[in-house]
Design a protein with these regions (language model features):
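Active-site-adjacent betaalpha module
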Residues: 1-48, 52-90, 95-302
């Protein structure tokens, strides 16, 4: 490559709002690279970056410890494999304040909003401990299905990834590398915007936690079949990365030739504290049951 890693990424500002690197300049540099276009790659490799956004960096609204170092390793991996990666897809968690997992959707008996990380159960609704300010019938229906069908509990998150804010944006240095690749390889970045339904969480990129219409992103699932390798990294390992992988492997559970093409970069993702044990159990199942490859970014050869 003509461009150096440090021309594209400044590791000292990962997770910060300002970007000292001029995007126009690095895209001009990308255009001067001599790579073959993505469509001519004999081996089709997809890099799927899950929610690598400002609000999930350490200083973000829902910061994940270790996220900034994850971004450094992710950008180094993409740089080292620039010509081998055919395409990049990124998920972008996108919300408004008035969603079922944000505080202002709920009040207690005294009219107070729940603190972030409060768990709200069906029993809490029945006892009057918490009640929905907005759409109480659908809110109860969501919690009921979440507990019965998904075996989960609604967690109230800090306001995060609010549409149009800096927290909603891709992390700056990651974005530098992603769009450098896009121009250098003549490959359009696929953006998977998720999380806009006010009545459901959407951790995974394929479907909502609960949806009365039963929508799943078949278009993206069908695209996955065309790749020889699917590389996955991002934040948080315990939630959006885990659920994205789970949704993909469950859809392809009878097709191991697809699931064994998945490579998860274990040094390029971190968990929200408190969820580590259950997360490791889930990833072990991905490996044993679905033949998903769990590797370090420095170990995989493209």
């Amino acid at each position: 490559m003509k461009a150096k890693y440090t021309d594209i990424v400044n590791v000292n500002v990962i997770g910060k709002a300002e970007n000292p690197i001029n995007v126009n300049e690095i895209l001009k540099m990308a255009d001067k690279e001599a790579f073959i276009p993505s469509r001519q790659n004999k081996e089709r490799v997809l890099f799927l970056g899950i929610d690598i956004q400002q609000d999930f960096m350490e200083n973000g609204a829902l910061g994940v410890p270790g996220a900034c170092k994850d971004v450094e390793r992710i950008t180094q991996f993409i740089y080292n494999n620039m010509d081998k990666i055919s395409n990049i897809a990124v998920s972008i968690d996108t919300h408004t304040p008035h969603q079922i997992f944000h505080p202002c959707w709920w009040i207690d008996e005294n009219g107070n909003y729940p603190e972030p990380y409060t768990l709200i159960t069906l029993a809490d609704l029945d006892s009057g401990k918490w009640k929905a300010v907005i759409n109480p019938i659908a809110s109860r229906d969501y919690i009921e299905h979440l507990e019965q069908d998904r075996k989960k509990t609604l967690c109230i998150w800090p306001y995060h990834c609010i549409q149009g804010t800096t927290g909603n944006a891709l992390e700056n240095q990651f974005a530098n590398m992603v769009y450098f690749h896009s121009v250098a390889k003549k490959a359009v970045v696929q953006r998977l915007v998720k999380g806009q339904d006010p009545l459901s969480e959407m951790y995974g990129v394929i479907r909502l936690e609960y949806d009365t219409k039963g929508f799943i992103n078949l278009e993206f699932l069908n695209k996955l079949e065309k790749f020889d390798k699917i590389i996955i990294a991002g934040e948080a390992k315990s939630h959006c990365v885990l659920e994205s992988i789970k949704q993909i492997v469950e859809y392809y559970k009878s097709r191991p030739e697809i699931t064994k093409k998945i490579y998860v970069l274990e040094d390029c993702m971190s968990s929200i504290p408190g969820f580590e044990t259950i997360t490791e159990q889930a990833f072990l199942e991905f490996k044993q049951r679905y033949q998903v490859n769990i590797v370090k970014s420095t170990e995989i050869t493209l």
